[in-house]
């Protein structure tokens, strides 16, 4: 499980990422990204970019029953993705909301394939640095 500050949990946050974010695709995963914004007014005279740079990235994983009818399979995939993300957290740009969408073809993937595809997607989105 990811630590609480790194989790994307509210429906409105997922909706914002889906509707306004950008999308990158691979054969087994899709990555949606959206830069997080606070209110238009900067707090205590702090610039907006500086404020966002302190906020950790928030990540959500979306996996539907189309991937597998069996919850055991879906949960295994989510556990693998969360383990990969825990290792990549220090290298992720702060201030972003990310949603990883798992495609039905991901059932036959193993950990290494998920790791490779996730690194590739995060690099293409320019959210992964120093890795």
Curated annotation (Swiss-Prot):
Q: Which UniProt keywords apply?
A: Endonuclease, Hydrolase, Nuclease, RNA-binding, tRNA processing
**What broad class of enzyme is this?**
hydrolase
**Which is a Gene Ontology cellular component entry for this protein?**
ribonuclease P complex
Q: Per its UniProt record, what SUPFAM superfamilies does this chain match?
A: Ribosomal protein S5 domain 2-like (SSF54211)
InterPro entries on file: Ribosomal_Su5_D2-typ_SF, Ribsml_uS5_D2-typ_fold_subgr, RNase_P, RNase_P_CS
For molecular function, the Gene Ontology terms on record are: 3'-tRNA processing endoribonuclease activity; ribonuclease P activity; tRNA binding
Record has Nucleotidyltransferase as a keyword: no
State the name under which the record lists this protein. Answer: Ribonuclease P protein component
The protein's organism comes out as Cyanothece sp. (strain PCC 7425 / ATCC 29141)
What is the gene called? Answer: rnpA
